[in-house]
Structures are given as C-alpha cells and as structure tokens.
C-alpha cells in the first residue's frame, strides 16, 4: 500500500536512534522519529505529517491511519484529545514495530482513536463531532470507526506480524484496501488483552511445602476429537437420554466405527474416531412399564396407556473436528493472542466424567452418588448429599484436573403429604388432620414449594415422571373433569371406581401436571423423585447443617479427593480416557508456597498511638487495654425490643450500662442514657410494615430528627428484619444495630466488644489501621501526596426459582488516604441476572465526587476489585466496566488515573494442603495452611497475572484460598507488591479482630449488595412480582446514612 514504511526499533536504550516514519498524509510516508543520545527525549515525527506535533502522535506515529481525502470532523484519541481531520476510512493500523523501549513507560497499554465527522461522499454534512450518526437516504449506515493498538510487549520487541481487521473480523491487507467506504470498519486489538505476569512470581515470605488438589493430565496433541450433534425425539429426560445413548452404542458398533463415544446427556457426543457416515439416523426402543399411571386427563376420562416399548428417533450429525494442537500451543507457547480452545477442553471434560455418569447425578460440574455417603436430613423436606467436583484447568505445569469434595441440597424422595409436612410449618399436623383445607395464603405457599418438582405416582408401578406446574384451585373433593362422551365425573369417584382407592385428603388440591391440557393427580398418590437439586432458598438451619457436612479437616478432605481420583467412590472406568489418549495422574500436585508476614497494626491507648503485631498462629489480636484507632461520638440513640419474656426485658438496663462502659473502654463515646426509655413491642409488629414505620418515625421525632443509632433487640431471627433495615435506612434515616436476646443473657466481653466495633464502624469511626501506611509499604507505586482510591464491586442475583426479580449491584470506594479504611457505597438494581454492571459510570462518578469532597483532590490511582466474575466473562467485564470507569474519569478535564482491575474469586475448588516431608505425615497434616500463604506458581495460569492467597485462619473444615486475577494493570505492580497490598488490606476489615479471607473492598461490596437485596425481598407479606423486563429501582438512602458504612 502506498505511503507504508517500516519503522525501526532502537536496539539499545542508551543510544536510541531515530525510528522510521509511520503512515503519512495523502499517501506520503511519515518521516523518521528524531534520535536521542540518552533515550530521554520524546519520539518526534520528522516527516511532513500535519499531525506530527501532537504529543500522542509524537510518541506513537503508527497510531495514524492512512488518510484519504473526503472526510471532515475530528479524531478523539484515548478519550482525551482531538485531532482535526481529513482522516477518513478505510483505516489501516500498522502494528509493526512498536516504539523504542525508552518510550514504553510513557505510553498507555492500549492507544485508541475514534474518528468522528462526515464520511466521504456523504450527501449532507453531519454536525461536528457527531459520531457520524447521519445516514444518507437508502444507503449503508455511516461510519463509526475505532482504532486500537495491541498491548505493548514488556520486552519492547517488535511484534512478528501485521494484523488487519475489517468489518469486525480478521482479514487481509488486500481486503482492507477494498473496503466499501460506507461500511463500518474497525481496527481492534486481539482478544487476549489480559495482563501478563510481570515477573517469575513473588519471593517475599518463608517457603512452605504444599500440595494442591490438581492432578496432571497427559494428552496427545495429535488426538482428534469428532464432535457430533445429537437430536432425540420425542425429547427424553436426562436419565432416558443416557439409556438411549448406551443402547445406541451397543446395537451399532460398526456404524460408530467401534468407538465408545462420550455423551454430555444433552446434545453433544464426542468420539475419538470418525463414524462411518457424517449424518446418520437411528431408532432406539426402550421398554416402558406395562402399568398405566394414575393420571386423570380432562377430555379423555381414562388413564394414559403406556406401550411395552417406546421408540425414539436419534439424529447424529458431525459438527466439527477438534484437535489438541491448539491446546498444546496455549499451554506451552509464550505468546499473547492464542485463544483457549474451549470446545476441545469441554470435550475432554465430558470424556473424563463419562464413566462416573453411569452411577451418579450430574449437577453443574459436580457428580453426586450414594457411594460418597448416605443422604443426611437437613430439615424442610431437603437432604444433603456429598459428591465430587471435577474440571480441567490450564496451568503452568500443563493441563490439570481439579477435583474436590462437593455438597448440595436435594429434595427428599418421599410422599408429597410427608414432604409438605416437613417443608411447610403450618402443615406439620397434616397427617392427623386429613380434613384440613388450605387458606389462600397457604395455597400460594404450597404451590410455590411444589412448582417444577418432578413426581411419580406410587400406588402402581410406572417409570413415568411428571413436572408439577401448579395446584388446582378446587379441592380434590370438588374437582370434576369431562370424559370423551361429555359426561362430568368427580375425581374422587373416578379413583374409587377404577382403582378402589378412597382419597383421604379430600380438602387438598390436586397437582396440575399438564402444561397445555389439565392433567390432575391427587397429592397422596405422588412421590417426589430422587436426585432433584433443591433450588429454593435454604433456611439458616438448613444452611448450618449442610455446612457441617462439609467441615472435614484437611487430612479427611485430602483422603476423600484421593479416593475419588483412584475410583473408590464410583465405578470409574479408564476405557474412555484410554480411547482419547488421556492419562490422569493419581497424585496431587506438589508445589511450594510462601507465608507473608503480618503487618504491624495501629490502635489507640489512653490518647496515644499503640502498635501491635498479630503474631499468634491465627493472626488474631485483642482490644484488651487498647482503644480503637478512631472512636465515633454517639450522643443520640434509642433502643427498641421486639418480643422477649419479662425476665429478658429486665436485662435491658444491665445491657445498656455494660455496652456503654465497654464502648468507653474502647474509646467510643456512647451516651450512657438513651434519648427515650427503651421501647418494648411484640415481635408480631415486624409483620406489619405500616405500623413498624410509624413506630420508628415517632422515635426519630422524639430525637428531634437527630437520632444517630437505633439498637433493636429481637426474640429470634425474623423475616421482618428486611423491612426494618429498609425503613430505617431509606425512610427514617437512622443506622440500626440488631442483636438477639439469647446473647444478652450472657453479655460476654467478646459479645460486647464485637457489638461496639460494629457500631463504631457504622457511625463513622475507624477500628483498626495499618501502622505503616501504603506509601511506606509500596513506595515505588504509592505516594502520600497522590491519593489512591480502592474500589470494590459485586452483583447479587435472586435465587434460582425467582425468574423476575432484578439483580442488585453495589460499588464501594475508600474515602480516606493514606489509611484507606473508610468506605461508602452506592447500590442499584438492574436487569434480572445480568452480571455486567449497567450503571457503573454513574455510581463511580458519585463516588469520585465524594472522594473529592473528603480528600480534596481526585485519586491519581484506582485499584478496582471485582467480585463474582467467572473466567468466561473476563473479557466482557474488562471491556465494558473498564470503559465505564474511564468514561466517568474523562468527565474531568485532563484527568486520567492509572487503573488496576482485579477479579476476586471465592467460588472455586482449589484447595491447598500441608505436604508431608519424605513420605511421612507431620503434625501439620491435619491443620489448615497458615494465614498469609500465597501461591503464584505451578497451579496458576500459564501466562496471566493471577495468584492464590489464603489470608485467614480456617477454624472449621478446610480453608479455601481466594483467587486473585489481575486483568488490567496500568500501575505496573510486581507480584510481591500486589500480594503484599491485598494481604495487608485483609487486616483492616472493620468488624473483625483477625484477617479476613476476602480483600475488604470486595467484602464490603458483597455486604452492600446483600443489603440492597434485602430492600427488594422484604417480608413475605409485602413481596410482589414484576415482569422479567421490569427493573424495580431500589429505594433511595437518606443523605445522613449513605455517607456511612451502614451495611457493615
């Protein structure tokens, strides 16, 4: 192409000569860059380009595309500066070479230019800077052109190839030259823009030998996998689909070329060899029980007959050929831009669990089987089941299989009457009261409990399964249906006549199991099918019981995991793995971790600063003889009691006195007297939102509108807690602190201390601070005079059975520097189950404004912690949410802070264990790894910047380290620096006297998002449904609350 010249990369930093020109104007190549004897002078264009004087272009002449006369407007570069046009498409981005190494620190990771204005030959001129939104009549859409550069290599070496993108797809240089000038034309970076690991890993801390539940997998890069699509009609259940696949393989060995294909139970079949034909149709017949199921179907008036055999048509079609070479390149080649072959990885995952699927229930990536232990009753019609999780992961050591113990709640397989007796408290006496009917509210609760559950009838043998869609409005006794002759029949009479069965629970409704036509089944004749995951919200008691099932000490968990891999808990066969040339190691991965030292903490003591180092094994510290770092002043507060006995009420005066005394000892000024005498109400008040709000308003009025704190003492946990928090924080404007009477009966020093610390944090105080500020800890990055803001973000979604409620997002940000231990939040509701934060730019803008008011200047750096993102969403989250933060920052002229974007993951299955030395077990083998343990080798990503950090001491079960993945890093952290930063932050969580497992910005965001969820859920008496397309906004916080850590 005319005007194209090669640039030159200087070989020596200290003697950098001038580089070649970029792409010039009007077809002429840009001139060479000016030389520099010492590498300090800026790169300057020496050619005739009209744009050479712009600093961005001086730094990077390759940013300029090839201009063609005809377009007007301006180019907006990096969201900050503009260039005058003509600069029309087609755009060609020249990626080779990057600038000399001395300039690398001066440039952003990605330079981007968006061109605005009037496209060539457009009929009318668009307004200046209008994104080319003008559309000529009956012509293709106008231009919206973006140019972006690849992230610069850290070594400063030139990229090895030119890459051209046109019309949002990779293309050739020749095709670029012939792009229609009215088509959208984009020059974009490669997908792999995730930050690379900056070094070989950290070195700080004492070494500790560990093992991880990752098992190395050897695979043959030359092994092809043939992916077939499977279409079965009529659509079978998952269990039936597996039976069909098994019989299909048994009956057609020659057609399938003798292979034993792996099946995911839905649509995908994977074979190590190609079938005889790429498209083939089979007919598979399965035996079905002769008995007729007892289901009354309206308009037929007879039982649904079942045939001896049911025939399924199976269409198998070749979709693609997958090869292991791409995965081998991804694992072993140190290059950016190599995509992870997800299809091949998924195929291998299916292959490795195929053997276990024959005797297990698959839920997500976990398999549950009786061989892992009997189901345990956890109450409420649910049982807890043990299983195992397995997933292939690309790691530094190669492909590894992550195997872990898994727990989940399932519906108990029992009769519907018995199930409802356990599930619904108001039906506990149902077997003794067979004539009992359901009130309107009870009918809704029972329907909610049974909806979508699979059942089978029990008075006769049948393998037919049904989904419960709803309940009949009429009771069984009054329910009629019309037979084929048009005669109305009573359901009760029908079952007596045809099955000699007297319906016992006549005043209960029938189950409606037909979607299109009404099909009725009496409740007492139905049984809940086994193996159904419990999707409803677990109660606190159920959650506690299922967590206890998973509280194995490290040695026990390690033994279970080893047993799974060796096949002790399922009939695992290596047949499938052998066919696909896979070999899974039976040994856990051995590696070395490092234990980081705890930071020195700052407390108060009689008005002086006191430092302590948490040197206990669990890194806990005490406030004995110490003050909080900064105590709040609470002059106006009140107490209200909900429920409780007269004896418990008598304890309130003692509680108020001891709490105020403990606060005084901690340096917190809590008025020894409440503004009004304690108020005692029945707990039923929490059921009535209107009366509750009126009562709280009266308390606020008694304080002349200046009530700072309301302590709420409850007889027990109550669903009205959500209404209480919502009313207090959004309507009344007061911070609340709830506690239970059961704790007041003891009034231990630990309880009073914890309560005082929470109150202090909520009312603007500061409990703990680092003795050495962040600029002292990481002087290469942080400066005292350049403030830094730590941000955290999380999105919470409604429980799985809720198909309409909005998701809730929370963003928090630190408001002080250099302590960085006070955070405020912003919350929003957004589209149902959407993970990307929709209004991040608005919330970030509000937080920046608050930071500016508190600190006096905008932060020069932003460290953003994003919780709750899966690996498949990394690129989308980085692209959209980083853009939102950048957009917010660009509203301040000339403001461009350096941003580091880190994803925080707790929901993973990597576990770290003490490793026995010389094959002998040590006294550490049954202990959790110590707080501060960090791992950034062997089991981490082959190239990207991630690590595991266990910052807390696990008191129960086996510790789960937190996985931190740096997606974007403009601050150029080294491994040791970012690990030390996060580790030390974990000691500053406001309501704990020990380090927490999650970095506080992410932890606070999680708490704030949960609070927003409470605002929507409310108590059952005030719940409402919305359409999936409607997003109910969260109620607005009162001004005197939203600047506090009320959610803590």
UniProtKB/Swiss-Prot annotation:
<dbReference type="GO" id="GO:0003723">
    <property type="term" value="F:RNA binding"/>
</dbReference>
<dbReference type="InterPro" id="IPR036085">
    <property type="entry name" value="PAZ_dom_sf"/>
</dbReference>
<dbReference type="GO" id="GO:0004521">
    <property type="term" value="F:RNA endonuclease activity"/>
</dbReference>
<dbReference type="Pfam" id="PF02171">
    <property type="entry name" value="Piwi"/>
</dbReference>
<dbReference type="GO" id="GO:0010492">
    <property type="term" value="P:maintenance of shoot apical meristem identity"/>
</dbReference>
<comment type="function">
    <text>Involved in the RNA silencing pathway. May bind to short RNAs such as microRNAs (miRNAs) or short interfering RNAs (siRNAs), and represses the translation of mRNAs which are complementary to them. Regulates shoot apical meristem (SAM) initiation and maintenance and leaf polarization through the trans-acting siRNAS (ta-siRNAs) pathway which probably modulates the expression of the ARF2, ARF3, ARF4, ARF14 and ARF15 genes.</text>
</comment>
<protein>
    <recommendedName>
        <fullName>Protein argonaute 7</fullName>
    </recommendedName>
</protein>
<dbReference type="InterPro" id="IPR003165">
    <property type="entry name" value="Piwi"/>
</dbReference>
<feature type="compositionally biased region" description="Gly residues">
    <location>
        <begin position="16"/>
        <end position="37"/>
    </location>
</feature>
<dbReference type="GO" id="GO:0031047">
    <property type="term" value="P:regulatory ncRNA-mediated gene silencing"/>
</dbReference>
<dbReference type="GO" id="GO:0005634">
    <property type="term" value="C:nucleus"/>
</dbReference>
<dbReference type="Pfam" id="PF16486">
    <property type="entry name" value="ArgoN"/>
</dbReference>
<dbReference type="GO" id="GO:0005737">
    <property type="term" value="C:cytoplasm"/>
</dbReference>
<dbReference type="InterPro" id="IPR036397">
    <property type="entry name" value="RNaseH_sf"/>
</dbReference>
<feature type="compositionally biased region" description="Basic residues">
    <location>
        <begin position="131"/>
        <end position="141"/>
    </location>
</feature>
<feature type="domain" description="Piwi">
    <location>
        <begin position="709"/>
        <end position="1017"/>
    </location>
</feature>
<feature type="compositionally biased region" description="Basic and acidic residues">
    <location>
        <begin position="1"/>
        <end position="14"/>
    </location>
</feature>
<feature type="region of interest" description="Disordered">
    <location>
        <begin position="1"/>
        <end position="50"/>
    </location>
</feature>
<dbReference type="InterPro" id="IPR012337">
    <property type="entry name" value="RNaseH-like_sf"/>
</dbReference>
<feature type="region of interest" description="Disordered">
    <location>
        <begin position="121"/>
        <end position="141"/>
    </location>
</feature>
<dbReference type="InterPro" id="IPR045246">
    <property type="entry name" value="Piwi_ago-like"/>
</dbReference>
<dbReference type="Pfam" id="PF08699">
    <property type="entry name" value="ArgoL1"/>
</dbReference>
<dbReference type="Pfam" id="PF02170">
    <property type="entry name" value="PAZ"/>
</dbReference>
<dbReference type="InterPro" id="IPR014811">
    <property type="entry name" value="ArgoL1"/>
</dbReference>
<comment type="similarity">
    <text>Belongs to the argonaute family. Ago subfamily.</text>
</comment>
<dbReference type="InterPro" id="IPR032474">
    <property type="entry name" value="Argonaute_N"/>
</dbReference>
<dbReference type="InterPro" id="IPR003100">
    <property type="entry name" value="PAZ_dom"/>
</dbReference>
<dbReference type="GO" id="GO:0035194">
    <property type="term" value="P:regulatory ncRNA-mediated post-transcriptional gene silencing"/>
</dbReference>
<keyword id="KW-0943">RNA-mediated gene silencing</keyword>
<feature type="domain" description="PAZ">
    <location>
        <begin position="422"/>
        <end position="530"/>
    </location>
</feature>
């Amino acid at each position: 192409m005319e005007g194209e010249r090669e640039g030159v990369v200087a070989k020596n930093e200290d003697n950098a000569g001038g580089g070649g020109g970029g792409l010039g104007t009007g077809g002429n190549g840009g001139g060479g860059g000016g030389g520099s004897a010492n590498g300090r002078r800026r790169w300057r264009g020496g050619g005739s380009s009209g744009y050479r004087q712009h600093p961005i272009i001086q730094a990077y002449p390759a940013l300029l595309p090839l201009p063609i006369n005809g377009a007007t407007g301006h180019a907006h570069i990096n969201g900050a500066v503009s260039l005058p046009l003509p600069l029309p498409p087609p755009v060609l981005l020249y990626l080779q070479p990057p600038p000399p190494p001395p300039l690398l620190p001066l440039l952003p990771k990605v330079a981007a230019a968006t061109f605005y204005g009037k496209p060539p030959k457009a009929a009318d001129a668009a307004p200046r800077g209008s994104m080319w939104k003008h559309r000529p009549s009956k012509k293709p859409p106008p231009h919206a052109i973006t140019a972006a550069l690849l992230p610069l290599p850290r070594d400063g070496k030139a990229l090895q190839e030119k890459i051209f993108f046109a019309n949002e797809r990779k293309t050739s240089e020749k095709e670029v030259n012939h792009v229609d000038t009215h088509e959208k034309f984009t020059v974009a970076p490669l997908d792999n823009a995730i930050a690379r690991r900056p070094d070989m890993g950290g070195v700080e801390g004492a070494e500790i030998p560990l093992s991880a539940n990752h098992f190395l997998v050897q695979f043959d890069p030359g092994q092809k996998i043939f992916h077939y699509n499977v279409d079965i009609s009529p659509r079978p259940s998952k269990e039936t689909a597996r039976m069909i696949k098994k019989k299909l393989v048994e009956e057609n060995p020659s057609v399938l070329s003798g292979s034993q294909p792996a099946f995911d139970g839905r649509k995908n079949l994977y074979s190590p060899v190609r079938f005889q034909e790429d498209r083939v149709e089979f007919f598979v017949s399965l035996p079905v029980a002769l008995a007729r199921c007892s289901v009354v179907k309206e308009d037929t008036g007879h039982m649904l007959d079942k045939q001896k055999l049911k025939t399924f048509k199976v269409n198998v079609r070749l979709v693609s050929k997958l090869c292991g070479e791409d995965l081998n390149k991804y694992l072993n080649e140190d290059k950016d831009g190599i995509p992870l072959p997800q299809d091949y990885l998924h195929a291998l995952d299916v292959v490795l669990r195929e053997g276990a699927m024959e005797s297990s229930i698959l839920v997500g990536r976990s398999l549950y089987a009786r061989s892992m232990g009997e189901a345990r009753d956890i109450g409420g019609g649910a049982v807890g089941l043990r299983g195992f999780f397995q997933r292939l992961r690309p790691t530094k050591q190669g492909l590894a299989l992550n195997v872990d113990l898994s727990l989940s709640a399932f519906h108990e397989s029992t009769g519907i009457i018995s199930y409802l007796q356990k599930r619904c408290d108001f039906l506990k006496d149902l077997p003794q009261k067979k004539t009992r009917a359901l009130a309107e509210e009870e009918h809704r609760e029972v329907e909610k409990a049974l909806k979508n559950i699979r059942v089978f009838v029990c008075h006769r043998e049948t393998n037919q399964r049904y989904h419960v869609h709803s309940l009949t409005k009429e009771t069984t006794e009054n329910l009629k249906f019309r037979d084929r002759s048009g005669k109305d029949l009573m359901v009760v009479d029908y079952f007596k006549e045809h099955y000699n069965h007297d319906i016992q629970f006549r005043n209960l409704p029938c189950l409606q199991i037909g979607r299109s036509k009404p099909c009725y089944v009496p409740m007492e004749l139905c049984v809940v099918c086994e193996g159904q995951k419990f999707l409803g919200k677990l109660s606190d008691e159920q959650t506690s019981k299922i967590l206890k099932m998973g509280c194995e000490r490290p040695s026990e968990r390690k033994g279970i995991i080893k047993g799974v891999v060796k096949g002790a808990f399922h009939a695992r066969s290596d047949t499938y793995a052998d066919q696909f040339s896979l070999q899974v190691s039976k040994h856990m991965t051995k590696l070395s971790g490092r234990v980081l030292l705890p930071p020195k903490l700052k407390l108060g003591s009689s008005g002086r600063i006191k430092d302590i180092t948490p040197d206990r094994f669990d890194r806990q510290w005490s406030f004995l003889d110490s003050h909080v770092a900064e105590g709040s002043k609470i002059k106006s507060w009140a107490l209200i009691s909900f429920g409780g006995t007269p004896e418990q009420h008598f304890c309130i005066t003692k509680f108020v006195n001891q709490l105020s005394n403990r606060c005084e000892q901690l340096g917190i000024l809590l008025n020894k007297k409440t503004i009004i005498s304690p108020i005692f109400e029945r707990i039923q008040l929490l059921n009535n939102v209107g009366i509750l709000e009126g009562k709280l308003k009266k308390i606020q009025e008694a304080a002349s509108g200046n009530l700072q704190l309301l302590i709420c003492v409850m007889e027990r946990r109550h669903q009205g807690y959500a209404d209480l928090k919502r009313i207090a924080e959004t309507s009344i404007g007061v911070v609340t602190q709830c506690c239970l009477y059961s704790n007041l009966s003891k009034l231990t020093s630990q309880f009073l201390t914890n309560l005082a610390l929470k109150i202090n944090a909520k009312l603007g105080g500061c409990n703990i601070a680092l003795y050495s500020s962040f600029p002292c800890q990481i002087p290469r990055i942080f400066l005292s005079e350049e403030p830094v803001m730590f941000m955290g973000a999380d999105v919470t979604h409604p429980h799985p059975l809720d198909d309409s409620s909005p998701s809730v997002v929370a963003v928090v940000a630190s408001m002080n520097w250099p302590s960085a231990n006070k955070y405020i939040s912003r919350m929003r509701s957004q589209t149902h189950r959407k993970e990307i934060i929709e209004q991040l730019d608005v919330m970030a803008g509000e937080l920046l404004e608050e930071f500016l008011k508190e600190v006096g200047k905008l932060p020069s750096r932003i460290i953003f912690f994003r919780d709750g993102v899966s690996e498949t969403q990394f690129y989308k989250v980085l692209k959209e949410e980083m853009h939102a933060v950048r957009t917010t920052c660009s509203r301040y002229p000339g403001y461009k802070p350096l941003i580091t974007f880190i994803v925080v993951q707790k929901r993973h299955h990597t576990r770290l264990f003490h490793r026995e030395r010389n094959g002998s077990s040590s006294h550490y083998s049954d202990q959790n790894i110590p707080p501060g343990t960090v791992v950034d080798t062997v089991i981490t990503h082959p190239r990207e910047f991630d690590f595991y950090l266990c910052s807390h001491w696990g008191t129960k079960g086996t510790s789960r380290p937190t996985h931190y993945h740096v997606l974007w890093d403009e601050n150029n952290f080294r491994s040791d620096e970012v690990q030390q930063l996060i580790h030390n932050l974990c000691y500053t969580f406001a309501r704990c006297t020990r380090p927490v497992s999650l970095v506080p910005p992410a932890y606070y965001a999680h708490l704030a998002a949960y609070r927003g969820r409470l605002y929507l859920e409310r108590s059952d008496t005030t719940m409402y449904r919305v359409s999936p397309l409607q997003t109910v906004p969260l109620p607005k916080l009162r001004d005197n609350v939203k600047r506090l850590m009320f959610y803590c």
